[in-house]
């Protein structure tokens, strides 16, 4: 298919920049499955598959350098973003993909089955009702409207020495004001996306 050839070329170009060439085929399979399901179940507002490459896949992979530990949770994962691309890139890490939407979890279970991704565990539950036996090394989300809300709703999930990783667009000046924990902000560029992108890394320790 010509369309798929173009998408594969876009994907390969970006993955070369990330030095992740080896995972191209699996990411393409995920993208095609997402595009197929999205036509029926409205899993993401982005309809154009070329835009999905940059705004979904590359934006997810861009935060790889800041993931901490082996036990990761993606809260409000939706159709597995950023969790699925991260899990494909890091098969040695374990990812819990949390969402309350049944259609999205059904999609993730199908992704797990068809693509044979063994290091993900999709779970359908509201975040406040999820109480795992151990805390997570990194709690990731791009679903919360504010950093304060993210910490409020997920503080029971982060390990004692764990990390919150919030994906943002513009530098979140006002959102940082009420944060009592130590944090830093890392700006990053995404192939195919113009404008600011940053992630906020918040340690599970209070400021001194």
UniProtKB/Swiss-Prot annotation:
- Which residues of the sequence carry a binding annotation for S-adenosyl-L-methionine? 76, 81, 127-128, 142
Name the GO cellular-component terms. cytosol
What positions belong to coiled-coil segments? none
The UniProt entry, under SUPFAM superfamilies, shows: S-adenosyl-L-methionine-dependent methyltransferases (SSF53335)
What keywords does the record list, in alphabetical order?
Cytoplasm, Methyltransferase, rRNA processing, S-adenosyl-L-methionine, Transferase
The record's catalysed reaction(s) read: guanosine(527) in 16S rRNA + S-adenosyl-L-methionine = N(7)-methylguanosine(527) in 16S rRNA + S-adenosyl-L-homocysteine
User: What organism is listed for this UniProt entry?
Assistant: Legionella pneumophila (strain Corby)
Could you say which protein family the record assigns here?
Belongs to the methyltransferase superfamily. RNA methyltransferase RsmG family.
Task: Quote the InterPro entries the UniProt record gives.
Answer: rRNA_ssu_MeTfrase_G, SAM-dependent_MTases_sf
Q: What does this protein do?
A: Specifically methylates the N7 position of guanine in position 527 of 16S rRNA.
Q: Any idea of its EC number?
A: 2.1.1.170
Group of enzyme by EC: transferase
Full protein name? Ribosomal RNA small subunit methyltransferase G
Q: What gene is this protein a product of?
A: rsmG
Taxonomically, the superkingdom here is: Bacteria
Keyword Hydrolase carried by entry: no
């Amino acid at each position: 298919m010509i369309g798929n050839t173009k998408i594969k070329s876009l994907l390969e170009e970006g993955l070369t920049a990330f030095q992740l060439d080896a995972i191209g085929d699996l990411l393409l399979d995920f993208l095609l499955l997402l595009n197929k399901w999205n036509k029926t179940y409205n899993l993401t507002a982005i309809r154009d598959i070329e835009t999905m490459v940059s705004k979904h896949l590359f934006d997810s992979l861009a935060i790889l350098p800041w993931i901490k530990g082996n036990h990761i949770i993606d809260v409000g994962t939706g159709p597995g973003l950023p969790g699925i691309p991260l899990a494909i890139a890091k098969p040695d890490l374990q990812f819990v993909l949390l969402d309350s939407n049944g259609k999205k979890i059904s999609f993730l279970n199908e992704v797990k089955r068809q693509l044979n991704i063994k290091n993900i565990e999709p779970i359908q539950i509201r975040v406040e009702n999820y109480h795992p036996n151990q805390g997570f090394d990194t709690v990731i989300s791009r679903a919360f409207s504010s950093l304060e809300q993210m910490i409020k709703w997920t503080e029971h999930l982060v390990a004692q020495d764990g990390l919150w990783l919030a994906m943002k667009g513009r530098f979140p000046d006002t959102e940082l004001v009420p944060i009592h924990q130590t944090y830093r902000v890392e700006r990053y560029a995404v192939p195919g996306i113009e404008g600011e992108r940053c992630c906020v890394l918040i340690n599970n320790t209070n400021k001194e």
